[in-house]
UniProtKB/Swiss-Prot annotation:
It is an enzyme of class 7 (translocase). It is a multi-pass membrane protein. It is found in: Mitochondrion membrane. Pfam families: Oxidored_q2. This is NADH-ubiquinone oxidoreductase chain 4L. PANTHER family: NADH-UBIQUINONE OXIDOREDUCTASE CHAIN 4L, NADH-UBIQUINONE OXIDOREDUCTASE SUBUNIT ND4L. It catalyses: a ubiquinone + NADH + 5 H(+)(in) = a ubiquinol + NAD(+) + 4 H(+)(out). It comes from Chondrus crispus. GO terms for molecular function: NADH dehydrogenase (ubiquinone) activity. The chain crosses the membrane at residues 5-25, 29-49, 64-84. The keyword Transmembrane applies. Core subunit of the mitochondrial membrane respiratory chain NADH dehydrogenase (Complex I) that is believed to belong to the minimal assembly required for catalysis. Complex I functions in the transfer of electrons from NADH to the respiratory chain. The immediate electron acceptor for the enzyme is believed to be ubiquinone.
Length: 101
């Protein structure tokens, strides 16, 4: 019981740290992307430990699906970020509204 509460607290702490990273660092898009990935990781962490506690495999499968989608989202986001850096030579968020498309 104590171990389950401890894992839930760790997952909640990871989620809150990633929210704090997004809200405090709104100028660097790379840090915001890393904080978003940490959010996905904390949600997956919570799903895995909840499914272990409930002795259900569905949470673990869903967690694997979340991690797969997060990896694809991360690679697409980094590719867009590299192209944006080559064009503007900066990765600040202030100039993002100048993008055409």
């Amino acid at each position: 019981m104590f171990q389950q509460l401890n894992c839930t607290n760790i997952s909640s702490l990871l989620f809150l740290v990633s929210l704090l990273g997004i809200f405090l660092n709104q100028k660097n898009i790379l840090v915001m992307l890393m904080s978003l990935e940490m959010m996905f990781l904390s949600i997956s962490f919570n799903l895995i430990f909840s499914s272990i506690r409930l002795d259900d495999i569905i949470g673990q499968i869903f967690s694997l699906l979340i991690l797969t989608v997060a990896a694809a989202e991360s690679s697409i986001g980094l590719a867009i970020l590299v192209i944006y850096y080559r064009i503007r030579s900066t990765i600040t968020v202030e100039l993002m509204n100048l993008m055409k498309g």
